[in-house]
Amino acid sequence: MDIGKFTEKSQQALAEAQNIAVRFGHQEVDAEHLADALVRQEQGLVPRLLDRMGQKPEAFAEALERELGKRPAVSGPGAAPGQIFVSKRLNAVLVKAQDFARQLKDEYVSVEHIFCVLLEEPASTIMGRIAREFSLSREKVLGVLEDVRGSQRVTSANPEDTYEALQKYGRDLVEEARKGKLDPVIGRDAEIRRVIRILSRRTKNNPVLIGEAGVGKTAIVEGLAHRILKGDVPEGLKERGLFALDMGALIAGAKYRGEFEERLKAVLKEVEKSEGRIIMFIDELHTIVGAGKTDGAMDASNLLKPMLARGELHCIGATTLDEYRKYIEKDPALERRFQPVLVDEPTIEDAISILRGLKERFEVHHGVRISDSAIVEAVTLSHRYITDRQLPDKAIDLIDEAAALIRTEIDSLPADLDEANRKIMQLEIEREALRRETDVASRERLERLENELADLRAEQTALLSQWEREKGSIDHVRSIKEDIERTRHAIEEAERAYDLNRAAELKYSRLLELERQLESAEKGGHDETRLLKEEVRPDDIAEIVARWTGIPVTRLLESEREKLLRLADVLHERVVGQEEAVDAVSEAVLRARAGLSDPSRPIGSFIFLGPTGVGKTELCKTLAEALFDTEENIVRLDMSEYMEKHAVARLIGAPPGYVGYDEGGQLTEAVRRKPYSVVLFDEVEKAHPDVFNTLLQILDDGRLTDSHGRTVDFRNTIIIMTSNIGSPYMLDGISEGGEFLSGVREKVMEELRRHFRPEFLNRVDETVLFKPLLPAQIARIVELLLGRLRGRLAERKIDIRLGDVARDFIAKAAYDPVYGARPLRRYLQHNIETPLARKLIAGELRDGTTVEVDVVDDALSFRIE
């Protein structure tokens, strides 16, 4: 007997039979041990055959083990442990199994051959008796085996991989639609009709759905499955099966060369045998190119081509545009066998309709309500702010995550109840400490504490019962909704089966009753102040968007009008003496937000011109804080680093083949991470002229393509470029009242035009001239800087006061029109912060004191109160 002629599963069963014999303490392996091993085999064929015959494999195995337990067991010293022998009877069974395999023209002895021989054991044996008890016979097994195996012969050591290949390596989408496992498909009628038209063709009847990730390619195929189920398809497609092929399952575990091809051929043979009744769906179609390819082996695409060419295989593919170009178009023979169907991103209106159709599924799954305004908000916010993903996928994700957020809040302790629990624990610890004390004050405190604890416990009990009541109410609503969904599914099934009496009974009796129950359950419990939130509202959607994109949620929900009307005031608080600049920036932002400027361009683009230290960069920081709540949302690029021609590549990333290609560009990566920011190009005149060619498409279209081909969205950024061009004209051409003399602006603009090309300057919204600061404005800046110092000293409760004389003295001493306000910070550091630090360390200045700063003998003096 050649053990090499037994399949892998047969060999595993023989090894397991030996283990069973050892476990029972038997001295030889008999037919019953092998039968037990076959019936208990994981993913084995015998349990599947028993299931098909209506017998439970577990019951059969238990009956065998009961009888095996009655046999005499041998223990103690003697033969080497585990050394047992094959009985003469089992040997005969295996020889008969070999003969039976030859009779069926199979090359290997498989588990079904052994099982059929075991069932023919005489009634005097345990095996024969149990087989008759369970009404099992060789003929019955062969009848079921024919359904599973078909006309296939055992020609390899792993024949089970090729049995029922479609069930094993695919999902029947029509069957899943029948069971209600697929989500409803709303819209996409044009694409589904196009797929149906292609499937109805005589040749090249294989559509491939091509579109960006998340636009709903798989949903179109699920929509087709729904239509096939309802019979809403042409005659040629009615009663068709639609199987989604799982390439991962096909490849997984294929250890030896040829094993993958064998599995795929088994799938294709089943499809071929169906004579066009089965349509195969391959998601991620590009995976078939190169799948299973090893030295000398064929990949999946080459196995599919002949059947696709002959029209024996009806196949629907789905893949993205990039992968179609990269894999399918490279193989023209494969490409011409498929007919492309382009799937575009749905419009905002269509995406809202899709989400409305899915709303009920999400409500039932999460057990919460989803308001219609939340659906509209999810689509509009995702379209506006999540630019690197596609509708409807990104909007569905928003709704799903917001509903999950509400559900987790329902399942966890409410904040009020959690706070009450913590207070009770804190007071109980305090009570235990006070019980050890004997003085009168401690006794009084203990008495007060007991009363407080009693009140808190009463509050906790009330809150707990309210929470449980509300949670029970929400769960009750959820169970009613689940019943409604099951009833609707049952109505659809009854209508498909033309069981009109049952359909009418369910529709006009059971469904109406459930809807009445739902209405009364949703009405109840709304009068009291609720602990739990059970509805997804627009603010929940905004909160999720804020988490994903980093935009503060308060800013997102605050009305645009309020935010923009306050913008000029907020900027004036921190930027002193630059009314024209502040007004120009705030007005440009107002125009952009009011929709009077092109929405495809950035919020605003400005060139700030002026001498050093007049507030150009400070205005950028203030603008970032006012619009985006934080100074951190500023992308700052020092243009003196981009003086060489090749440095331009650093903005958008190195081209393919160059070092640093994978790292991305400094500008594009920064804006991709923070799409809502102020982009500051500092000292812009120092950059190479080619940099401005890159900026042209940002200023005009609000977008920039990086070296990887990804489009970065600049529509929600404010572009600011600072420069010192024309500073000498501005310093010399200022009047005593702080206004520019006539002709100064023209000279500065002329200088600017000499530096930059007209097509660049023409795209900038506003060129703003910053005036040199006057002494009066310097005094205000002194107050601003001292305000920041007060903030640092506030932690120690130290206050600092500055008289008018001292303020004017500092302004006069530190002011230099050439350097602007920057010398002020240095002056305050040397003449106020350093002396105060000395006094703090020496112990002269203590917490809670006030420092008066005055001028004595042309120097600052400090008086501590």
UniProtKB/Swiss-Prot annotation:
Q: Where is this region: Repeat 1?
A: 6-71
Q: Where is the Clp R domain?
A: 3-151
Q: Which domain of life is it from?
A: Bacteria
Q: Which PROSITE patterns match?
A: CLP_R, CLPAB_1, CLPAB_2
Q: Where is this region: Repeat 2?
A: 86-151
Give the molecular function GO annotations: ATP binding; ATP hydrolysis activity
Answer whether the UniProt record assigns the keyword Cell membrane to this protein. Answer: no
The ranges of region (Linker) come to 346-550
| Region of interest (NBD1), residue spans | 164-345
Compartments it resides in = Cytoplasm
Q: Which region ranges are annotated with the description C-terminal?
A: 773-865
Q: Is Nucleotide-binding there in the keyword field?
A: yes
**Which residues does the annotation say bind ATP 2?**
G610, P611, T612, G613, V614, G615, K616, T617
Q: Where the protein is mainly located, per its record?
A: cytoplasm
What does the record list as GO biological process?
cellular response to heat; protein refolding
Q: Which UniProt keywords apply?
A: ATP-binding, Chaperone, Coiled coil, Cytoplasm, Nucleotide-binding, Repeat, Stress response
Q: What is known of its domains?
A: The Clp repeat (R) domain probably functions as a substrate-discriminating domain, recruiting aggregated proteins to the ClpB hexamer and/or stabilizing bound proteins. The NBD2 domain is responsible for oligomerization, whereas the NBD1 domain stabilizes the hexamer probably in an ATP-dependent manner. The movement of the coiled-coil domain is essential for ClpB ability to rescue proteins from an aggregated state, probably by pulling apart large aggregated proteins, which are bound between the coiled-coils motifs of adjacent ClpB subunits in the functional hexamer.
Q: Which family does it belong to?
A: Belongs to the ClpA/ClpB family.
* Subunit details: Homohexamer. The oligomerization is ATP-dependent.
From the Swiss-Prot or TrEMBL record, give the protein name.
Answer: Chaperone protein ClpB
Tell me the organism.
Nitratidesulfovibrio vulgaris (strain ATCC 29579 / DSM 644 / CCUG 34227 / NCIMB 8303 / VKM B-1760 / Hildenborough)
Taxonomic lineage: Bacteria, Pseudomonadati, Thermodesulfobacteriota, Desulfovibrionia, Desulfovibrionales
Write the gene name.
clpB
